[in-house]
């Protein structure tokens, strides 16, 4: 859990090393609703919030048709063998630098 938020936080830390990135995440609809209620009440001001509808996320959630343990093995192999580890290295990402260099973009 927290994979997307962690990736975003890692990129923010790369671009702004002195910035503190706080993350709060929830799994399952009940926990997501609780997280949102707490955020609305001001508990998570300044946090990067991540909510996953399925407990266990996309790979381990209730809608999966494959064994989550086997799927995790395949995913980890894919990650290990991926031609790049950072989205900025992907030839398919063409505008991420626009965010970094945009004076109106606030992190």
PLM regions and their residue ranges:
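Iron-sulfur (Fe-S) cluster-binding modules
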Residues: 1-107
């Amino acid at each position: 859990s927290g994979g997307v938020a962690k990736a975003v936080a890692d990129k923010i830390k790369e671009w702004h090393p002195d910035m503190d990135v706080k993350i709060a995440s929830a799994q399952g609809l009940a926990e997501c609703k609780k997280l949102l209620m707490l955020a609305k009440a001001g508990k998570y001001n300044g946090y990067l919030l991540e909510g996953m509808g399925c407990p266990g996320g996309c790979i381990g959630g209730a809608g999966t048709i494959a064994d989550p343990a086997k799927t995790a093995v395949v995913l980890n192999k894919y990650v290990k063998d991926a031609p790049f580890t950072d989205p900025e290295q992907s030839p398919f990402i063409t505008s991420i630098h626009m965010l970094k260099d945009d004076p109106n973009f606030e992190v």
